[in-house]
Amino acid sequence: MQIELLQRGEHMMTVCNACRYCEQYCPVFPAMEERRTFGKADLLYLANLCHNCGECLYACQYAPPHEFGIDLPRKLAELRIASYEEYCWPASLGGAFRQQGLAAGTALAAVLSAVMLASAWLFNPGALWRPNPGGDFYSVVPHGVMVGLFGGVSLFVLSSLVIGISRFWREAHHEPAVSLTAAGLARGLRDGLTLRHLHSSGVPCTTGEDVRSPWRRWFHHGTFYGFLLCFASTSVAAVYDALGWSAPYAYTSLPVILGTAGGIGLLIGPAGLMVQRRRRDPALTDPAQNGLDESFLLLLFLTSLSGLLLLVLRDRTAMGILLIVHLGIVMALFVTLPYGKFVHGLYRLAALIKYNLTTRG
């Protein structure tokens, strides 16, 4: 991690700790006030506790063009993106995705789709082009192949996520051990799941000075809960399959209902967040993270779009090609989860739990 980034972050937090004008805005400032020095672990914890509401920038008397140049939202955004690379495993992949961003995500989706398409064409070419009145996905990609591919990828991704979040949690708790209480855990989960701090003191997020909007929070909700519904759909389908109830499932079945609702959320949420990003004051964000953000949002959107199209056209000739493209996009999304913007939700939830165990404990 860059020494200059840590030194600049420490300087800003020291100035803010002396001023304390913004102490009521969000959890960052009460947590900051408990510290007199700011090492790497402190800075990365505070950075992930920040929800980038932007209020402190416009309230700060030392913000640019003041010679101190205090722009805390941007500096914490830079530290956040550095924390993803710091804690991820294996570290080399984190650096690659951070540097390439959007290009890496889209290229990976295209390559995986092309490889799966070529494999299907070589081993079962007829299934790609013929109508499939039953909508049987396994006639295109055998059940064992699909389970093996995604089972292996899921195991790798889960291992990477667990290692990363464990590293963050362990380093964030470098001070004397804090007991994990049910009350603190419940408050942290509540704050994370409701996005309670994705606004300042109960008012909507700033998109620019004196410009407020609740949409950033709502689009986050659409994205997050859309993802959860799609995950629930896949989980229910896995249970059905284990019970011998094979896909495809009826439009009125639970997996399809959950997946459709989640898919709609994953169309509206990422599209809305992409628009919101372009409307926000550039002073609030780190330009270096644009590629990671946009890659994640694009993969979520394309996963949902291809999945919904596959549902509608599953008994048509296009089903085979659509299935391969959808699976390639989903696999690209999965592979990039531990190294992109997805982890910000996990690190922020961990930071909120720590905050509720310590500062509010």
What function would you assign to each model-found segment?
Residues M1-I3:
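Recognition helices and adjacent regulatory flanks at domain boundaries
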Residues N17-F38, L44-Y45, E55-S83:
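Iron-sulfur cluster-binding cysteine motifs and their immediate structural context
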Residues R8, A41-D42:
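Secretory-pathway extracellular proteins and peptide precursors enriched for disulfide-bonded cysteines
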Residues N48-L49:
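Structured cytosolic domains appended to multi-pass membrane proteins
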Residues L6-V15:
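Local sequence-structure signature of Cys/Sec-based thiol-disulfide redox active-site neighborhoods
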Residues N52-Y58, L302-S304:
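A generic, lipid-embedded transmembrane alpha helix
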Residues A77, S83-G361:
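Membrane-embedded alpha-helical bundles of multi-pass integral membrane proteins
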